[in-house]
Amino acid sequence: MKIHLFFFILLFWVTILPARSNFDPKYRFERCAKVKGICKTFCDDDEYDYGYCIKWRNQCCI
């Protein structure tokens, strides 16, 4: 059981933690504005999720 916990933590460390953005919130919003995106909670079916805006729940939809 301990080996499963170890592999789960290792998997979390390798996949989830690097996916966090290192940009400050200001730069994340400016990046969305550069591509003429709109910050929304959820993107529609015909929109592309470009990344996160200032709040982590808001997505930049193009």
Curated annotation (Swiss-Prot):
Family as reported in the entry's similarity comment: Belongs to the beta-defensin family.
UniProt KW keywords: Antibiotic, Antimicrobial, Defensin, Disulfide bond, Secreted, Signal
Signal sequence annotation: 1-21
Principal localisation: secreted
Gene Ontology annotations of biological process type: cell chemotaxis; defense response to bacterium; innate immune response
A Gene Ontology cellular-component term: extracellular space
GO MF term list: CCR6 chemokine receptor binding; chemoattractant activity
Official protein name in the record: Beta-defensin 110
Organism superkingdom: Eukaryota
Task performed by this protein: Has antibacterial activity.
Disulfide bonds: 32-60, 39-53, 43-61
Subcellular location: Secreted
